[in-house]
Amino acid sequence: MQKRAIYPGTFDPITNGHIDIVTRATQMFDHVILAIAASPSKKPMFTLEERVALAQHATAHLGNVEVVGFSDLMANFARNQHATVLIRGLRAVADFEYEMQLAHMNRHLMPELESVFLMPSKEWSFISSSLVKEVARHQGDVTHFLPENVHQALMAKLA
């Protein structure tokens, strides 16, 4: 039986830190679903369709990754995808409290759903989509932090 994992997030936009996490997850699980949340309350810069397309291109080299947009409750989405593992990235101690709350809630809603926390490589440990967008808005060079297709899309959005 295949071990299916979900790596959810808003990915607005997907960064090299996200790519680092999903790449390592592909070595641990048979099938990884990169689940892109609609998250309208976060007022994303990119539409859900744009974020899905950007992530598909950025992960095309990873054969066991499927990119899917979703707007459902995570536990329901995981159940519908027949996934029993939820991948979450932890950049800093500050992330842990929030992620622990989410993990407990998801376990309450779907007891068989395990949360697995991965720390990004040191090179990406301070990167977030929000920070990258903020630096780019002020003409800072964010080339190093984004896949090339995402960098081009971000620069076009900000033009």
From Swiss-Prot:
InterPro entries the record matches: Cyt_trans-like (IPR004821), PPAT (IPR001980), Rossmann-like_a/b/a_fold (IPR014729)
Subcellular localization: Cytoplasm
Reactions that this protein is recorded to catalyse: (R)-4'-phosphopantetheine + ATP + H(+) = 3'-dephospho-CoA + diphosphate
SUPFAM superfamilies: Nucleotidylyl transferase
Residues that bind substrate: 10, 42, 74, 88
Gene Ontology MF, one: ATP binding
Residues annotated as site: Transition state stabilizer: 18
Cofactor(s) demanded: Mg(2+)
Residues that hold ATP according to the record: 10-11, 18, 89-91, 99, 124-130
Keyword Ribosomal protein in annotation: no
Functional pathway: Cofactor biosynthesis; coenzyme A biosynthesis; CoA from (R)-pantothenate: step 4/5
CDD domains assigned to the protein according to its UniProt record, in alphabetical order: PPAT
Keyword Cytoplasm: yes
Highest rank taxon of the organism: Bacteria
GO cellular component, one term: cytoplasm
Keywords, alphabetical: ATP-binding, Coenzyme A biosynthesis, Cytoplasm, Magnesium, Nucleotide-binding, Nucleotidyltransferase, Transferase
Description of how the protein assembles with itself and partners: Homohexamer.
Stated role: Reversibly transfers an adenylyl group from ATP to 4'-phosphopantetheine, yielding dephospho-CoA (dPCoA) and pyrophosphate.
Name of the protein this chain belongs to: Phosphopantetheine adenylyltransferase
Organism from which the protein derives: Escherichia fergusonii (strain ATCC 35469 / DSM 13698 / CCUG 18766 / IAM 14443 / JCM 21226 / LMG 7866 / NBRC 102419 / NCTC 12128 / CDC 0568-73)
Name of the coding gene: coaD
